């Protein structure tokens, strides 16, 4: 994948996105693990939150960046081992989805180590909530995972039960707002949505 790099006119910094960076939809982004050289680019996204899908502690340098920019960190420790393979924990993915679909956390970045498998599973489950057809969901996962896509990830996405998520988030719904074309957006009722508790946040 080719990195897009440009110059920030305000301070002359070179803006380099994290590996495998892309927009999922308005206000939702995905990538591999951000490095210090990516911080200037991340600042342009005006992030409110980051979903981190690895069990390892977040680097101190990254935590300082989050604190300086008032970004909340939600950590959901999902093992990425392949030998032996670690099953994707449904309850953990469900908890991460609750954070992801709450617009009060947007703009939000999802990342794991490489932004392919754990991130791809979470985005795939989001697409099912958005009522994407399964073939398109799996195609998106494979496109982002490249040659290293995993059949067990596809099986997890296919089997993921979105009914349980919808039952937990009755007050969150999708509405369409048209500006020449219809755009999907999340809405919520403030009094009915419980604020998820960050597992690691320094804000």
Swiss-Prot record:
CDD domains for this protein: PFA-DSP_Siw14
Protein name per Swiss-Prot or TrEMBL: Inositol diphosphatase DSP3
EC number: 3.6.1.52
Signal peptide bounds: none
PROSITE patterns reported for this sequence: TYR_PHOSPHATASE_1, TYR_PHOSPHATASE_DUAL
Oligomeric and partner information: Interacts with FLZ1.
Tissues expressing the protein: Highly expressed in roots, stems and flowers. Expressed at low levels in leaves and siliques.
Catalytic residues identified in the record: 112
Catalytic reactions on record: 5-diphospho-1D-myo-inositol 1,2,3,4,6-pentakisphosphate + H2O = 1D-myo-inositol hexakisphosphate + phosphate + H(+); 1,5-bis(diphospho)-1D-myo-inositol 2,3,4,6-tetrakisphosphate + H2O = 1-diphospho-1D-myo-inositol 2,3,4,5,6-pentakisphosphate + phosphate + 2 H(+); 3,5-bis(diphospho)-1D-myo-inositol 1,2,4,6-tetrakisphosphate + H2O = 3-diphospho-1D-myo-inositol 1,2,4,5,6-pentakisphosphate + phosphate + 2 H(+); 6-diphospho-1D-myo-inositol pentakisphosphate + H2O = 1D-myo-inositol hexakisphosphate + phosphate + H(+)
Enzyme class name: hydrolase
Superkingdom of the organism of origin: Eukaryota
Transmembrane is among the record's keywords: no
UniProt site (Transition state stabilizer): 118
Function: Cleaves the beta-phosphate at the 5-position of soluble inositol pyrophosphates. Has highest activity on 5-diphosphoinositol 1,2,3,4,6-pentakisphosphate (5-InsP(7)), 1,5-bis-diphosphoinositol 2,3,4,6-tetrakisphosphate (1,5-InsP(8)) and 3,5-InsP(8). Possesses phosphotyrosine phosphatase activity in vitro. Dephosphorylates the phosphoinositides PI(3,5)P2. Hydrolyzes para-nitrophenyl phosphate and O-methylfluorescein phosphate in vitro.
Region (WPD loop important for active site topology): 76-88
Gene Ontology molecular function terms on file: inositol-1,5-bisdiphosphate-2,3,4,6-tetrakisphosphate 5-diphosphatase activity; inositol-3,5-bisdiphosphate-2,3,4,6-tetrakisphosphate 5-diphosphatase activity; inositol-5-diphosphate-1,2,3,4,6-pentakisphosphate diphosphatase activity; phosphatase activity; protein tyrosine phosphatase activity
Pfam families per the UniProt record, alphabetical: Y_phosphatase2
UniProt-annotated location(s): Nucleus
């Amino acid at each position: 994948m080719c990195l897009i790099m440009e110059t920030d006119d305000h301070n002359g910094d070179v803006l380099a996105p994290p590996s495998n960076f892309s927009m999922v939809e308005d206000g939702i982004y995905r990538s591999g693990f951000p490095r210090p050289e990516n911080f200037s680019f991340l600042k342009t996204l005006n992030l409110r939150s980051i979903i981190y899908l690895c069990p390892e502690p977040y680097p101190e340098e990254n935590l300082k960046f989050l604190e300086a920019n008032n970004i909340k960190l939600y950590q959901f420790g999902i093992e990425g081992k392949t030998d032996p393979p670690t099953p994707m924990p449904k309850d953990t993915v469900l908890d991460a989805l609750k954070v992801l679909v709450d617009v009060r956390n947007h703009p939000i970045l999802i990342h794991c180590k490489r932004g392919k498998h754990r991130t791809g599973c979470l985005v795939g489950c989001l697409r099912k909530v958005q009522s994407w057809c399964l073939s398109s969901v799996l195609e998106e996962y494979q496109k982002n995972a490249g040659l290293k896509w995993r059949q067990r990830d596809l099986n997890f996405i296919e089997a993921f039960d979105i009914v349980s998520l919808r039952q937990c988030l009755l007050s969150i719904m999708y509405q369409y707002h048209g500006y020449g074309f219809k755009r999907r957006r999340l809405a919520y009722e403030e009094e009915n949505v419980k604020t998820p508790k960050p597992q690691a946040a320094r804000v």
